[in-house]
Amino acid sequence: MRLVEGIQANSFLVIVGAGPVGLMLSTCLARLGYRIKHVDNRAEPTPTGRADGIQPRSLDLLRNMGLKSAIMAHKPARVYEVAFWDPAGDSKGIVRTGTWASCPAFIDARYPFTTLLHQGLIERVFISDLVKNGVKVQRPWKISGFKSDEAENPEYPVEVHLEHVDGTEREMVRAKYLFGGEGARSFVRERLGIGITHKDPIAHVWGVMDGVVKTDFPDIKVSPRIIFWPVSSRRQN
């Protein structure tokens, strides 16, 4: 195996992670003409459903950016209401315990619904806009280290080390800023010693599935929240 190492041109910003957050930032800065280095450790955009919901105010923002039409071209689901279901006491089955509007009246939003669309399709909308502005996400690459020294290089103080996921290539980039958009397992955040404040990680379990469902469940087009209580915390009558 031959290792190829190189030093890249200085960048205004290095972005690690090409999920919706990293891509949104990259899209905004690319439109303003900034030099961006954007890497992601996956060979392709997200292949399955993950964070598939676009909130009403986010859709407003996408409209202002001229990207809403590209999102809506995929004919996403529009959710106007959320329903909650709980186990039906001592009997079998579940019962609806409440509903509320997906976008309550007190929220100042142009679109009163949550938009549901495969995350990979959302990412591709941003990626298409990036290409128009001369930015390509470098895949599959990851960050391996970084340091900052303003005394050594006050204009581009951040030194970022990147490598191909198979270890055959490495790069060193100098930048003004480094942005970690890698999600829960962020290398950047961990190296900076920034923890995540959250509740008991086993208190709630989420499941996400992609599929075509044949069902008579009454709230299938609403956005149901079915709550299952663990044995240790079942409510007592």
Task: List each model region and its residues.
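Beta1/beta-strand and adjacent pyrophosphate-binding region of the FAD-binding site
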Residues: 3-21, 37
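Core beta-strand elements of the Rossmann-like FAD/NAD(P) dinucleotide-binding domain
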Residues: 9-11, 166-177, 181
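Conserved structural-core and active-site-/substrate-pathway-adjacent residues in large, well-folded domains
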Residues: 26, 62, 123-126, 130, ...
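Glycine-rich FAD pyrophosphate-binding loop
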Residues: 28-50
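Active-site-adjacent segment of FAD-dependent monooxygenases/related oxidoreductases
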Residues: 47-133, 147-153
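Conserved FAD-binding catalytic core of PHBH/FMO-like flavoproteins
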Residues: 128, 177, 181-237
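General small-molecule cofactor/ligand-binding pocket signal
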Residues: 136-138, 197
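A conserved short coil-to-beta-strand element within the FAD-binding core of flavoproteins
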Residues: 139-158
